[in-house]
Structure formats: structure tokens, C-alpha cells
A protein has these predicted regions:
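Metal- or metallocofactor-binding catalytic centers and their adjacent structured scaffolds
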Residues: 28-108
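Structured beta-strand/loop patches that form or line metal/cofactor-binding pockets in enzymes
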Residues: 1-42
Length: 108
């Protein structure tokens, strides 16, 4: 199985304060299975950063096997410029992808 596409969505909510806008990614496979994950930075300006990092990370996983989530996690952590320096935005991006991969694995 291979990852064919990743959509990154900046959702809107109907909340009165309008500050909560989740970042969700959907990973598609060549076998028709998809998985959803969320970057947990949905408040304030960090949501924009989370959206950007998930978009950047998404490009790196196209063609990879979604069932090898540890290999993908390691690639995002070790081979990206900011990965090993960590921080909430980086780990929110990795987590969104990792959650979507587990969703795929559960549906497989």
C-alpha cells in the first residue's frame, strides 16, 4: 500500500468566539483507504503555523507505506530541519500525520 495524496484542511467552526479552527489532514492510499488526523493547535496564531507544517510534512510522505508509521515518524523527526529541535508546532504536525496513519492501519 502507498500514500497517494494528503489533504490539509483548516476547518471553520460555528462557535461564537471563532478562535477555534482545527487543522485536519486526510491521507489517501492507492487501495482506497484514507485516514484522518488532527494537529491539536487550533487556537490563535499557532493554527496557521500548524497548517503550514502539516502541508510541508505531507509532501515528504507521498509514495511511502502508511502501515510503516514508525518509519514515517522517524523520517519527519530526523530528516527535517526543525524536527529534532521539537516544539509544539513540529510535534502537532507529526502527530496529525501519525493519527491519520493509525486510522488507516485500523481500517486495513
Amino acid at each position: 500500500m502507498k500514500i497517494t495524496k494528503v489533504d490539509v484542511l483548516h476547518l471553520k467552526t460555528n462557535l461564537k468566539n471563532g478562535h477555534w479552527r482545527p487543522i485536519v489532514c486526510r491521507i489517501y492510499t492507492d487501495e482506497g483507504i484514507y485516514g484522518d488526523g488532527e494537529a491539536a493547535l487550533a487556537y490563535g496564531e499557532s493554527q496557521i503555523a500548524a497548517f503550514g507544517i502539516v502541508q510541508n510534512f505531507a509532501k515528504l510522505i507521498i509514495g511511502m507505506d502508511p502501515l510503516q508509521h514508525e518509519v514515517i515518524w522517524d523520517k519527519l523527526y530526523r530528516t527535517t530541519f526543525w524536527g529534532q529541535n521539537g516544539g509544539p508546532v513540529i510535534f502537532a504536525g507529526i502527530s496529525a500525520i501519525d493519527i491519520a496513519l493509525w486510522d488507516i492501519k485500523g481500517k486495513y
